[in-house]
Amino acid sequence: MAANVFPFRDARAAPDPVLEAGPVAHGPLPVPLVLDNGSFQVRAGWACPGQDPGPEPRLQFRAVCARGRGGARGASGPQVGNALGSLEPLRWMLRSPFDRNVPVNLELQELLLDYSFQHLGVSSQGCVDHPIVLTEAVCNPLYSRQMMSELLFECYGIPKVAYGIDSLFSFYHNKPKNSMCSGLIISSGYQCTHVLPILEGRLDAKNCKRINLGGSQAAGYLQRLLQLKYPGHLAAITLSRMEEILHEHSYIAEDYVEELHKWRCPDYYENNVHKMQLPFSSKLLGSTLTSEEKQERRQQQLRRLQELNARRREEKLQLDQERLDRLLYVQELLEDGQMDQFHKALIELNMDSPEELQSYIQKLSIAVEQAKQKILQAEVNLEVDVVDSKPETPDLEQLEPSLEDVESMNDFDPLFSEETPGVEKPVTTVQPVFNLAAYHQLFVGTERIRAPEIIFQPSLIGEEQAGIAETLQYILDRYPKDIQEMLVQNVFLTGGNTMYPGMKARMEKELLEMRPFRSSFQVQLASNPVLDAWYGARDWALNHLDDNEVWITRKEYEEKGGEYLKEHCASNIYVPIRLPKQASRSSDAQASSKGSAAGGGGAGEQA
C-alpha cells in the first residue's frame, strides 16, 4: 500500500460464544456480576476474588438490537449486539434502549440483559442468583432507576444491586489509594460529555454540567463533511467507516486555528493527509470484453432465458396435468354411477352440470397437448448452436507475403516517404491507463481535526452550547479560590471520546489559559479510557462485597421503592421524591364546619 493510503477494514463482529461461568463463580458466596451499561457498548463480566486484574471483561458488544422479519434462514427473533454482524445493512432496523445516555426503553434493555446473562453462562434456575453492579447516567432520573430496579428484582430475581457512575468507577480504578481525594472529572462518551467536580471523594451533583455532544455527533459531522466533499461516493461513506476514521485517524489539535494554517501549506497537506481507500472493482464491464466474449455472453444469457421459460412451461404443464387428472377422475365417477360423490365433486369444482365438466376437460386436454409440443420444440431449439453472423476474416498468414512485397517495393521508390501527402500512416491506438484506485479514495485532511473539535467548539455543528473549556471555567468560578486550586491539581480524563491523540495536551493548554499566572495544575488521562469504568466497578464490588451499606436488597426495594439509592464514593446523590402533604379529614371537617357557621351568622346579620 502506498504512503498515507489506508484501506477500510470494515470489521465484522463475530458472534459471541456462550461461555461457562467456571467453578469460581459457583463458590459458597455469590460472585457479583459487573455490567457497564453504556450507550455505545455493553461490557459484562464476573468480579471473582483473586482474579488477575489484567483480563478484559468476558463480554463486549454494541448496545443495539434489531428484530428480524423472517427470511431464508427463518431468523425472525431479535438479534443483539455482535450477533448482528455488520451493522450497515441493518442500520434502518437498529434500535437502542437509550435516549442520549439514559435507558428509557426497558423492553430493549431486557434483551441486552438476557444476552449478557446467557452468554456469561448464568445457570441458576428461574433467577439470576448473583449481586449486580450496574452503571447509570450522571444524575439519572428517578423514573429510569425505578424501572431498572423493577426489571432486575421482578424479572430476574437478583438478591441485591448497586448503582454507580461509569466515570467515577474509572476514577476509583486509577486512584485506588486516593479515592477520597478531590478533583475534576472530564468524561466524554458516545452521546454526551460531563464535567464532574469531586469534593473529598463524593460527587458535587449541584455543580455538574453536561454537554450534549460526544462520539456519535462527531461521526455524524464527519460523515456530512465527506459526503459534501465526495458526492459521487455518497453511499460508501457510512457511519461505521466514519467511526473507524475517528478512532484510528483523528486527533485533537493543541491550537485549532494554528493547525488549520499548517494545513494550507501544500507540503504539509501532502505529508499528513490520509487517503482512505474505498473498495472497488478493477474490471470495468463492457469496456474490457472482446467481441467474442460479448457474443459468448449473449449466448449464455439466451440459454439462461430459454431454460427459465422451459422451466416455467413445465411447472404450468404439471399443474394443468394434475387438474386434468382430477377432472377425469370426476368423470369416471359419473360413468360408474356414483352420483352422490359426483355431485359433491362438482360442487367442489364450482361446476353446475356434466356438460360443463366435459367442455372444460376438452379445453384443458388441448392446452396440455399444446404445452407438451412447445416443450419438445424448445428442447430441439436448445440443441441447435447459434450461428455466428459475423463475416469471415481473411487468413492473416495469406496476407503476410503480399504485405512484405509491398514494403520491399516502397524501399526502391525514391519518391516515397511516410511524410508524403496522401499516404496514410498506420494508426496505433493508445489506450490510456487509469489508476482506478485513485478514483475511489477519500482524502481526509482537515477533517481529521474538525470532527473531534466539536466538543471544544459546539458551534461548528450549530449547537448553542459551551465547549469543554468554557464549561470547566464556569464550574471553577463557582468555588472559592482555595477549592479551585485543589480541584485543578487532579483533572482526570476518561471515556472513549477522550482517546484522541493530543487530548491531554489540549486540556493542559486550556487550563494554562484560564488559570492565574504561574499557578500549577495536573491533567491525567485514564490508563484505559474505555475499560477503566468496568475495571473500577469490579474493584469496587470486590472491596465492598460484605458492606450492606452500599447494596440495595430486595427487601429495601419493596419497602422504599425502585428509585431508592444507597450512596457511595462512585454513586449519584439520592434525592427522594417529596410529595406535598395532604390535609387530614378531621382538619377538613373542622374547616367546613367553621365555614358553615360563619355563613349562617352573616345571613342573620343581614336579615
Curated annotation (Swiss-Prot):
It is found in: Nucleus; Cytoplasm. Pfam families: Actin. Residues 584-607 are annotated as: Disordered. It comes from the Eukaryota. InterPro entries: Actin (IPR004000), Actin_CS (IPR004001), ATPase_NBD (IPR043129). GO terms for cellular component: cytoplasm; Ino80 complex; nucleoplasm; nucleus. SUPFAM superfamilies: Actin-like ATPase domain (SSF53067). One of its GO terms (biological process) is regulation of DNA repair. Belongs to the actin family. ARP5 subfamily. This is Actin-related protein 5. The gene is ACTR5.
